[in-house]
UniProtKB/Swiss-Prot annotation:
The gene is psbJ. HAMAP family: PSII_PsbJ. The keyword Membrane applies. PSII is composed of 1 copy each of membrane proteins PsbA, PsbB, PsbC, PsbD, PsbE, PsbF, PsbH, PsbI, PsbJ, PsbK, PsbL, PsbM, PsbT, PsbX, PsbY, PsbZ, Psb30/Ycf12, peripheral proteins PsbO, CyanoQ (PsbQ), PsbU, PsbV and a large number of cofactors. It forms dimeric complexes. This is Photosystem II reaction center protein J. It is found in: Cellular thylakoid membrane. InterPro entries: PSII_PsbJ, PSII_PsbJ_sf. The chain crosses the membrane at residues 7-27. Belongs to the PsbJ family.
């Protein structure tokens, strides 16, 4: 594995994981907010 200025895999994994968690969190927050306002 050569270090040719490539981004470390763990950084990519952390960023991707945080992005997924953020999207899921926003989705659930929107769902709960929508249900709360509807009810």
């Amino acid at each position: 594995m050569s270090e040719g200025g490539k981004i470390p895999l763990w950084i990519v994994a952390v960023v991707a994981g945080m992005g997924v968690i953020a999207v899921v969190g926003i989705f659930f927050y929107g769902a709960y907010a929508g249900v709360g306002s509807a009810v």
